[in-house]
Amino acid sequence: MKNVREFIWPLIGLLAVIVSGWLLYRELRGMSLDDVWDSLTAVPSHRYALAALSTLFAYAALAWYDRIALLHLGVRHISWLFVSVTSFTTYALSHNIGASVFSGAVVRYRAYTSKGLSAPQIAVLVALCSFTFGLGTILLGGVVLVADPTLLHRLEELLPSMLTNPATARIVGLLLLGFVALYVVGSVLHLPPLVIRKAKLEYPRPAIMVRQLIAAPLELLGAAGIIYFVLPSHLEPSFIVVLAVFLASFSAALVSHAPGGLGVFELVFLTAMPDIPKADVLAALIIFRLFYLLIPFALSLVVVLLFERARLAQAWRGRMVADGSVPPPPLSSSDQ
């Protein structure tokens, strides 16, 4: 059964790419590459700079996820720089590969074992980082739906009419915020672990929980900011609209298991932004993929190669010393 699951999820991801690609083709037919290029070149340079700063902000927040998990484990000897580079590499790879839990676990295992962490500790770290991200999505989703439940009307082509109803949307938002409130209560009152099937949620101590609530939304705010800043300034909707559409698009991309959410993310975003020219929206999404996914992915490959080269060189030197191939240092006069 496990082998079947390992085969079926990549197949679902591939199917999601094909279906969303076909739907995107229908959505974008008639648009020329010149239209998209004109939209890309129309973005002012200072807007590109703001998008780049939003990218740095988002990845800094992701590094805080790792730091919070290490504090939960009582690990304080690892430097912020090492944590930041590890987190950056982890998410840059997993965002593009698609299997975020698997690829994140592999990268973190290679990095954190070099700092003395055990496999069970790294498993807890990976789980807590994933939960922190989910907590941020739930928290922001609840806030957005309660603040403006009419936002789901933008997805009426993709969702049942019952869900896009403002009253239903507000109830969903309140339920999401209720989940966050229960998590806070569980942490403050030191409740026993919450068990759902095989998953067990250990409530962290309040100091960790508060950090999670602060850090969890920041990455999503930064990522949504990339798109917000490069949309046409005379047409751009409010930030809460961009954030709501981003949350829906990003969540759909994750659920689809498509590598990097390819096609799925764009389809949902374009559908939910009918009031902005499609070429301008597509240009903003291209910039998002470049800043948030492709450039970090290229840099992460360099980091992995340098790290593995250093580990290999260290292992080789250790083997040479063990085999006696490296002569001992000469004796000093005091030793003779």
Question: Where are the language model's segments positioned?
Answer:
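Membrane-interface segments at transmembrane-helix boundaries
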Residues: L73-S84, V107-A127, R197
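Membrane-embedded alpha-helical segments of transport systems
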Residues: T89-I97, T113, S118-G141, A252, ...
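Interfacial segments of multi-pass membrane proteins
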Residues: A111-Q121, A244-V245, E266-A283
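Transmembrane alpha-helix interface/packing and boundary motifs in multi-pass membrane proteins
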Residues: T89-G98, V245-E266
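Internal, well-ordered alpha-helical segments in soluble enzyme and binding-protein domains
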Residues: R108, S118, V124-F131, I138, ...
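Transmembrane helix boundary and interhelical loop/hinge segments in multi-pass membrane proteins
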Residues: S100-R108, V264-F265
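Predominantly cytoplasmic-facing regulatory/coupling regions of multi-pass membrane proteins
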Residues: M1-F88, V146-L254, I276-I287, F291-Q336
